[in-house]
Amino acid sequence: MNDTSDIKHTSQLTSGDFTEASEPFALFAAWFAEAVASEPNDPDAMALATADADGLPDVRMVLMKGYDTQGFVFYSHIASAKGRELAANPKAALLFHWKSLRRQVRLRGPVTPVTDAEADAYFATRPKQAQIGAWASKQSQPLESRFAFEQAIAKQAAKYIIGSVPRPPGWRGWRITPAQFEFWHDRPFRLHDRIEFRRTAPDAPWTKTRLYP
């Protein structure tokens, strides 16, 4: 086994006491704004965890494409592993980890598809090459070679030389509506700050609890 126990870690203190926050969405918005200003790459990247029919978890990085008090939105294809797993078990967990700030946010809850209008509106904002790629990619299916993929891209590009590219029928978005948040901030000597928010329904009040690190 490769021993990593001697890796040195540094801690950056927050300005102010985030543990006084009473509402998780406002706290997330404040932390995310700081991450956008501080994180060198992809502050909107989040780990998405789902589970298959046997309960075996899957996790992968995706990009958050929007959030509000209704939830957190991402896009993919219904034929992908995440799409299939969410169809069978529409619950998921997210993790944001901002190394530059020594912070992370975990949340989990039920998942629902966004409306076709929402998906169409977002797809229309994507670069044309990305739109064509969505048509060419049979996401998560076996691929013979990179060359075969490039041929599929060229074939789709030829179809849409002129005009807009419509959204593929299997390409959609999902919204995770949090039932639980946890905000974590690194502190020296592993004496971290952890604050949890829970609610029993989307319109229920939040209950806040401080957790041991």
Curated annotation (Swiss-Prot):
Family: Belongs to the pyridoxamine 5'-phosphate oxidase family.
Lineage start: Bacteria, Pseudomonadati, Pseudomonadota, Alphaproteobacteria, Hyphomicrobiales
Annotated FMN binding sites: R60, M61, V62, L63, M64, K65, Y75, S76, K82, Q104, Q139, S140, W184, R194
Xref: InterPro entries: Pyridox_Oxase, Pyridox_Oxase_CS, Pyridox_Oxase_N, Pyridoxamine_oxidase_dimer_C, Split_barrel_FMN-bd
Domain of life: Bacteria
Protein name, entry field: Pyridoxine/pyridoxamine 5'-phosphate oxidase
Gene3D superfamilies: Electron Transport, Fmn-binding Protein, Chain A
Role summary: Catalyzes the oxidation of either pyridoxine 5'-phosphate (PNP) or pyridoxamine 5'-phosphate (PMP) into pyridoxal 5'-phosphate (PLP).
GO terms of molecular function: FMN binding; pyridoxamine phosphate oxidase activity
Gene: pdxH
